[in-house]
């Protein structure tokens, strides 16, 4: 599991206020909470760009197959995205597989997300979110 995060707390593999040029390719994730995840801190500044998820298979995911949020504060989501850390030039391609029925297939909560490439993705088995906001052109929730 690889998380991209641009806020101040947490134990993640990539921890910077500027995250750029990150390829996550040809992976299989099973029995995890989340698979494709980018989260940024509420009210923070920085950027996330040129991130590529390609050929990711998910199985038995408890919370989210794909989750991208711009609303984290003190380790929890606020539900209100902020735009200080734009998420741009993201490619999510061939992310396929299943979430648990109690999980959510895709959740996107953005205030400043653009220039995404979203192709051949099919996360199934979980719920469809009705709380997505700011979904970039071409992506789907």
Regions from the language model: what does each represent?
Residues 1-141:
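Extracellular/periplasmic carbohydrate-active domains that bind, remodel
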């Amino acid at each position: 599991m690889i998380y991209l995060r641009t806020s101040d707390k947490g134990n993640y593999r990539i921890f910077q206020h500027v995250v750029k040029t990150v390829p996550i390719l040809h992976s299989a994730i099973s029995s995890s909470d989340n698979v494709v995840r980018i989260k940024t801190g509420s009210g923070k500044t920085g950027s996330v760009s040129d991130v590529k998820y390609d050929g990711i298979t998910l199985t038995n995911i408890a919370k989210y197959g794909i989750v991208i949020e711009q609303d984290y504060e003190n380790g929890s989501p606020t539900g209100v995205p902020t735009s200080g850390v734009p998420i741009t030039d993201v490619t999510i391609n061939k992310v396929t597989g299943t979430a648990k029925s109690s999980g959510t297939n895709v959740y996107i909560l953005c205030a400043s997300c653009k220039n995404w490439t979203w192709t051949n993705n099919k996360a199934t088995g979980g719920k469809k979110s009705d709380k997505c906001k700011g979904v970039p052109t071409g992506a789907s929730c």
